[in-house]
């Protein structure tokens, strides 16, 4: 169904069955397949391809050459009806590629709200990206990667499959990330190594001094105490009782399976 207020350029191909929402704009030479849904106010500028079972929310901006919901590159894929889901107010710049999920990986590639994907960024099958993340130019995520809120991935960086990146992490340009990255950490390198807390980013997001102090102390426990994670976990749990921001560490470690960067 195409809403009466939607605008579709004569050169665009919108297959019968596609859902185009109120005030959405489908620009020149775009292709929207029959199982796709484009939400209210979303703009596809030109030469955008939306394939498969793909749901794109409201007020997104998708620039020329972007490919959304394409068949993934997992050799086990056998044409299963997997999906791509994108939330609201995302900016997806030129030549970004976002692939559909796999049956082995939960069936869906999922992107939240208010994210920015810069030129040539790649999101592979089954990635789970939360809200307000930034992938800079040519940043690439392998399959099953998880990015929590407010993650920044520097240009030309690559993240190994199944890696979890915690909230408010900043990865410097050219980083190769093969293990999980705890919340609030700054890291860079090949392979990526931690080099402190993302203090400036946290200040910009309104974290107060006591909270920053607690996060720094937890970072020191993890990386500078000379003890194992199991040994310092009781102290982290104690901090979490008085500083809710520290609970992000506990949630992260409960999900982590690849070990953390060192």
Swiss-Prot record:
InterPro entries per the UniProt record, alphabetical: Acetyltransf_C, Acetyltransf_C_sf, Hexapep, Hexapep_transf_CS, Lipid_A_LpxA, Trimer_LpxA-like_sf
Residue runs in coiled coils: none
Query: What pathway or pathways are given for this protein in its record?
Result: Glycolipid biosynthesis; lipid IV(A) biosynthesis; lipid IV(A) from (3R)-3-hydroxytetradecanoyl-[acyl-carrier-protein] and UDP-N-acetyl-alpha-D-glucosamine: step 1/6
**Highest taxon listed in the record's lineage:** Bacteria
Transmembrane segments in this chain: where?
A: none
**Gene Ontology, cellular component aspect:** cytoplasm; membrane
The answer to keyword Membrane applying to this record is: no
Per the UniProt record, which EC number(s) apply here? 2.3.1.129
Q: Does the keyword Lipid biosynthesis apply?
A: yes
One GO biological process from the UniProt record? lipid A biosynthetic process
Q: What class of enzyme is it?
A: transferase
| UniProt keyword annotations, A-Z | Acyltransferase, Cytoplasm, Lipid A biosynthesis, Lipid biosynthesis, Lipid metabolism, Repeat, Transferase
- Catalytic reaction annotation: a (3R)-hydroxyacyl-[ACP] + UDP-N-acetyl-alpha-D-glucosamine = a UDP-3-O-[(3R)-3-hydroxyacyl]-N-acetyl-alpha-D-glucosamine + holo-[ACP]
**Cellular location of this protein?**
Cytoplasm
* One Gene Ontology MF term: acyl-[acyl-carrier-protein]-UDP-N-acetylglucosamine O-acyltransferase activity
Question: What is the similarity comment for this entry?
Answer: Belongs to the transferase hexapeptide repeat family. LpxA subfamily.
- Give the quaternary structure: Homotrimer.
* Cited function: Involved in the biosynthesis of lipid A, a phosphorylated glycolipid that anchors the lipopolysaccharide to the outer membrane of the cell.
Which protein are we looking at?
Answer: Acyl-[acyl-carrier-protein]--UDP-N-acetylglucosamine O-acyltransferase
Annotated organism of origin: Actinobacillus succinogenes (strain ATCC 55618 / DSM 22257 / CCUG 43843 / 130Z)
Identify the gene encoding this protein.
lpxA
């Amino acid at each position: 169904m195409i809403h009466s207020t939607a605008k579709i350029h004569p050169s665009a191909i919108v297959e019968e069955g596609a859902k185009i929402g109120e005030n959405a704009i489908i620009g020149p030479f775009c292709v929207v397949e029959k199982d796709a849904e484009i939400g209210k106010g979303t703009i596809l500028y030109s030469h955008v391809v939306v394939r498969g079972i793909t749901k794109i929310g409201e007020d997104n901006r998708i620039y020329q050459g972007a490919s959304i919901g394409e068949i993934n590159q997992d050799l086990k894929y056998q044409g299963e009806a997997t999906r791509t889901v994108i939330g609201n107010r995302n900016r997806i710049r030129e030549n970004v590629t976002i692939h559909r999920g796999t049956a082995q990986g939960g069936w869906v590639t999922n992107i939240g709200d208010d994210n920015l994907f810069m030129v040539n960024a790649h999101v592979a099958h089954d990635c789970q990206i939360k809200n307000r993340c930034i992938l800079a130019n040519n940043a690439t995520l392998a399959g099953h990667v998880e990015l929590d809120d407010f993650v920044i991935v520097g240009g030309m960086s690559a993240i190994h499959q199944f890696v979890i990146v915690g909230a408010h992490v900043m990865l410097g340009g050219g980083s190769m990330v093969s293990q999980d990255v705890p919340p609030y950490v700054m890291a860079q390198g090949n392979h990526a190594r931690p080099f402190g807390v993302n203090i400036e980013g946290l200040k910009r997001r309104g974290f107060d001094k006591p909270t920053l102090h607690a996060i720094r102390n937890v970072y020191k426990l993890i990386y500078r105490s000379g003890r194992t994670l199991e040994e310092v976990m009781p102290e982290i749990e104690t901090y979490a009782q008085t500083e809710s921001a520290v609970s992000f560490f506990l949630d992260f470690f409960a999900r982590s399976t690849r070990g953390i960067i060192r």
